[in-house]
Swiss-Prot record:
Site residues by UniProt (Transition state stabilizer): 319
Region annotated Disordered, chain positions: 595-620
Protein family according to the UniProt entry: Belongs to the peptidase M28 family.
PANTHER family, per the entry: METALLOPEPTIDASE M28 FAMILY MEMBER (PTHR12147), VACUOLAR MEMBRANE PROTEASE (PTHR12147:SF58)
Gene Ontology annotations of biological process type: proteolysis
Chain positions carrying an annotated carbohydrate: 53, 116, 119, 238, 797, 840, 948
Regions of this protein lying in the Vacuolar compartment: 42-392, 469-477, 531-534, 687-702, 751-986
Cofactor binding, note field: Binds 2 Zn(2+) ions per subunit.
Residue intervals passing through the bilayer: 21-41, 393-413, 448-468, 478-498, 510-530, 535-555, 666-686, 703-723, 730-750
Protein name: Vacuolar membrane protease
GO MF term (any one): metal ion binding
Chain sites annotated for binding Zn(2+) 1: 175, 187, 247
Length: 986
């Protein structure tokens, strides 16, 4: 047997070696940076930029997070005073410089408002027909106004009903209160110290703003956005037209832009040094998938401002816990937020256009104009793309029409030139009944079947994890990703190789891209409809996905022009088969003796074959002809000529395919894979990172696993057209990875000290019977494990009920008595009602009206709860605002009372309907039916939220001391301790 002729090595040929190497390099070169961006925060500069002092900012953060400082705590007052001192220390050099004879005109006027006057009664709104919650709040906001060069030079706010002249200013907001169980480093200490540095920056000579800048240090955000609501009563709330809200919904990492009002204001975020975020999060709020709100909804929804929400989003396991402290964050995270705030704010205050000074968006809202819906996302944390949703819609509609048309026209041209091998089973010779098999249908349905299987299996694994170990993603997100990716690639490779072994096809790539083109076309249609009808922009990546798939598919069609015409191939195949066409069978196909060379033996050398190797058993018997179409045989009686597919084509693929370009696959890979990995990869990590730990809040984790499965298919579908060319090494390794990660994900404990499970604490004291109940809410069976570790719960009857929050259960037991009344009143002699609160009820004779006076000891938060909603209420001395109605037709079931002073007495006037005037829902609620027919029953409750001193809430101290190290304790409600007294009004 002769030795085959040596072939030159082609580093980009469509053969196993180059395909495996190049695709692996491309995917790793893009996925690794995306992972790094998701996990690593850009380093802070070694030297602070001019006008900023990072060392000072970090010291401020450490001081601010030295204790819990919720609104209802003494330390909150300390933080308030400390902020005033820090603001004064920042401004003092500026004031001294301005008083000198040679004062620099670059130093702006600065006004500080310690707002201890604003208050407001409003409601949080009801859901459906449910009764609403009324709120009375007294604010302690600190407002700093830096006058801009284009601002009204007069102090217009000092005039009665004074209004500013000129263009609107810019508001930057951060709340300085924390939750009662968290130190508030990222929620929202970093926002607060960023405000202090913004004050320092814009009062530095050379940085004077063109537009006025308002820095709002608001208090009371954690208790239903109270501070932002009461800011609406300050004159400066009518001055600002745009805003930047600094928040923390996680506890470190990068600060993400996760919500904006419009395209125009979003463009200013392009000034951020390290932009990070996607419109996906904004649409999550719009569709109701994300329900946790920030001050953004007040500034935009009520005041009509246009702006941005910038917040930390991960890790959620530290959010609202004692690990939200300076120890568990970094200067790098602080700089990431601060640099973004400086860049965005500088752009907003320097803007000279009129986009934000048009007609108001609604009644009694500021004249901030109307923006357009936008699409925005970062790329590698270094660049930021932003454009109008309408632009995306127009481009999508255009591409939906043009792309199929281009493919269709190309297919027609291929057909006209007789090179359309796709969808071709055979080729007939004109004037004969002979047909040559082209095998052009091979691989037609391979792609949808294999991709369906490769997708269904990860979805099945998502169901399996949800049933067996649903919270493993809480601590092992990347183990889940590894499992999904490895099984997808292995299955796709194995099935594609099996199909290629039994039915090899040179059209595998073309068919694969055609199916991907069809699938993404359908996806783009759906996305375009949602963008047009509902303003949803989260599917922006589909446009780019479809664009890449269109170009890659077009390349597959264009490379068919390199093939021989089907008629030429068929004629040569007929001739090489040794069987003449039926119209020529009367003629001998073999040449005459004169035409034969002298040497006609088996080793004869044909003209033009001097460079060929020695003949073998498979060498063609026809001289002077290419061996491409060798060894064809007559297919029996059906008249179809078939071949053994031997020759220059790859392995046993169709013989006509040998002229296909060997390098175009690289072009196709680069047209589709990078854009998919950059956009879809970042979205996938953004989504799973922000949602991987929502299970502790009672949310089903299946949506996270399902997202991993779907995103895996989206990420690796561009690999499928080449995957049958992979060598076995990587898929085999990935199969082992799959086995290992599957076992780990099914049996590993889902929580750890670094990724703790949050449980929610509240202690309720019934002043009527003296009972004291500690409740802990969490997910089972871990909740029971935590309670079993508590000494005071040992031997008690633990009662557990379904919580109102998703999958959480609430378990209760008799707890250690709290000592929240202050040193002069705490005692161990039992619970005495008068020590905790005092109240008085005066009913108006002959009317369904009453006045309730309530005061709590050592607290500034109480509330009233009613068994049936009251029609209206009024708090003595309170302001009201028709933009925020405090009641509605469905009534008010609860009234929350907040005071800036301690031990304050609230005076609340209420009125209610008779039972026959305002029928209750027919839900059989026994508690409601127990209320007097024309009277009212309910509870007066006071709250305590300060746990900075040990032994004040021993039950909470006990939980922190004895629960496993994988448990984090967070607050369940506004108060850590709630004491209640039943009331009845006849």
């Amino acid at each position: 047997m002769a030795t085959p002729r040596a072939q030159k090595f082609n580093p980009i040929a469509f053969t196993p070696g180059p395909v495996t190497l190049i695709t692996t390099i491309v995917y790793l070169a893009l996925l690794i940076p995306i992972l790094v961006i998701s996990l690593v925060v850009p380093p802070a500069p070694e030297t602070s930029p001019e006008g900023v002092n990072l060392t000072e900012a970090w010291r401020d953060l450490q001081h601010l997070t030295g204790g819990f400082h919720p609104y209802n705590s003494r330390r909150n007052d300390d933080v308030h005073q400390w902020l005033l001192r820090r603001i004064d220390s920042i401004l003092r050099p500026t004031v001294e410089a301005g008083e000198r004879p040679s004062a620099n005109n670059d130093i702006p006027d600065v006004f500080v408002f310690d707002d201890n006057q604003s208050n407001l009664t409003y409601s949080n709104g009801g859901v459906g027909k449910a009764a609403i919650v009324g709120v009375y709040f007294e604010g302690t906001n600190i407002i700093v106004y830096i006058r801009g060069t284009e601002d009204d030079p007069e102090n217009w706010w000092e005039r009665s009903n004074g209004k500013p002249k000129g263009k609107g200013g810019v508001l930057v907001n951060a709340h300085y209160d924390s939750v009662s169980t968290g130190y508030g480093a990222t929620d929202n200490g970093m926002g607060v110290v960023s405000l202090l540095q913004l004050l320092k920056y814009f009062t530095t000579p050379g940085n004077k703003p063109r537009k006025g800048l308002v820095l709002l240090f608001n208090n009371g955000e954690e208790d239903y956005l109270n501070g932002a609501h009461v800011f609406s009563q300050h004159p400066l709330s009518n001055f600002t037209h745009t805003f930047l809200n600094l928040e923390g919904a996680g506890a470190g990492g990068r600060a993400a832009l996760f919500r904006t009002t419009d395209t125009e204001v979003t463009r200013f975020y392009q000034n951020a040094k390290h932009p990070f975020g996607s419109v996906l999060a904004a649409d999550g709020f719009k569709m109701g998938l994300l329900r946790s709100q920030t001050d953004y909804v007040v500034f935009n929804g009520i005041l009509g401002l246009r702006g941005l929400d910038l917040a930390f989003i991960a890790p959620r396991s530290r959010y609202h816990t004692d690990q939200d402290d300076a120890r568990h964050t970094s200067v790098d995270s602080l700089w990431h937020m601060l640099s973004a705030a400086i860049g965005t704010t500088e752009g907003l205050v320097s803007y000279t256009g009129t986009d934000f000074d048009g007609k108001s968006q609604g009644l009694d809202k500021v004249n901030s104009g109307t923006g357009t819906l936008g699409v925005w996302f970062d790329m590698f944390g270094s660049a930021f793309a932003v454009f109008r949703l309408h632009t995306l819609f127009a481009l999508s509609v255009t591409l939906l029409i043009v792309a199929p048309l281009v493919i269709f026209i190309t297919a027609i041209v291929l057909s006209k030139t007789d090179r359309m091998y796709l969808f071709s089973m055979s080729k007939s010779l004109g004037g004969t009944d002979e047909r040559v098999s082209l095998r052009g249908l091979r691989g037609l349905f391979r792609t949808p079947i294999i991709l369906a299987v490769a997708t269904v299996i990860p979805i099945g694994l998502a169901y399996l994890l949800e049933k067996v170990n649903p919270y493993i993603v809480h601590s092992s997100q990347f183990s889940v990703w590894s499992m999904m990716i490895s099984v997808w690639i292995f299955l796709a490779w194995f099935l594609a190789c099996a199909a290629d072994f039994f039915r090899p096809s040179a059209l595998h790539r073309a068919y694969s891209y055609t199916w991907i083109f069809i699938a993404t076309w359908v996806m783009l249609v759906i996305n375009t409809v949602y963008a047009n009808q509902k303003g949803i922009a989260a599917g922006y990546f589909v446009f780019f996905y479809f664009s890449g798939s269109f170009l890659a598919t077009w390349v597959s069609y264009l490379e068919l022009f390199a093939l021989p015409r089907k008629g030429d191939f068929a004629r040569q195949a007929i001739m090489h088969s040794g069987r003449p066409p039926s119209s020529l069978r009367s003629r001998l196909l073999t040449p005459s003796a004169d035409e034969l060379p002298s040497d006609t033996g088996p080793h004869a050398e044909y003209p033009g074959d001097a460079d060929e190797t020695d003949p073998t058993e498979s060498t063609s018997l026809l001289r002077g002809q290419r061996t491409t179409f060798a060894n064809y045989r007559t297919g029996g009686t059906d008249g179809v000529v078939e071949g053994t597919d031997e020759g220059p084509s790859f392995k046993h693929e169709q013989s006509w395919s040998w002229t296909l370009p060997r390098w175009t696959w690289v072009l196709q890979l680069l047209l589709l894979a990078p854009i998919v990995l950059i956009l879809v990869g970042q979205l996938a990590l953004f989504l799973t990172t922000s949602m991987s730990q929502v299970g502790s809040d009672g949310v089903s984790t299946f949506i996270v696993y399902l997202a991993c499965a779907v995103f895996t298919t989206l990420l690796f579908a561009p690999l499928f057209p080449f995957i049958h060319r992979f060598t076995y090494h990587i898929p085999t390794f990935l199969f082992l990875v799959f086995v290992g990660t599957l076992i780990y994900n099914l049996v590993a404990f889902p929580f750890s000290p670094a990724n703790r499970l949050k449980m929610f604490f509240i202690q309720e004291v019934n002043l009527d019977d003296g009972s004291n109940t500690v409740s802990l809410s969490g997910i089972q069976p871990y909740l029971t494990d935590a309670i079993n570790s508590i000494p005071s719960a040992a031997g008690q009857n633990i009662t557990c009920d379904q919580s109102a929050f998703g999958k959480l259960e609430k378990c209760s037991w008799a707890g250690l008595p709290p000592r929240v009344l202050g040193q002069d009143h705490d005692r161990d002699t039992g619970i005495v009602s008068s020590d905790w609160m005092s109240y008085n009820i005066t009913k108006t004779v002959g009317e369904n009206k009453a006045r309730i006076e309530i005061s709590g000891r050592n607290t500034r938060a109480c509330k009233l709860k009613f068994d049936k909603p009251v029609a209206d209420f009024q708090v003595s001395g309170s302001a009201v605002d028709h933009r925020m109605p405090h009641t509605s037709g469905q009534g008010v079931a609860e009234i929350r009372l907040w005071s800036r002073t301690w031990d304050r007495t609230w005076v609340v006037d209420i009125c209610w309907h008779d039972s026959h005037d305002k029928p209750e829902d027919d839900d059989g609620d026994d508690e409601k039916q127990d209320a007097p027919r024309n009277g009212l029953s309910g509870k007066v409750i006071c709250l305590w939220s300060d746990s900075n001193q040990s032994d004040v809430i021993p039950a909470l101290d006990e939980l922190r001391l004895y629960t496993p190290n994988w448990v984090a304790i967070s607050k369940s409600a506004d108060g850590l301790v709630e004491a209640s007294h039943g009331i009845t009004i006849q």
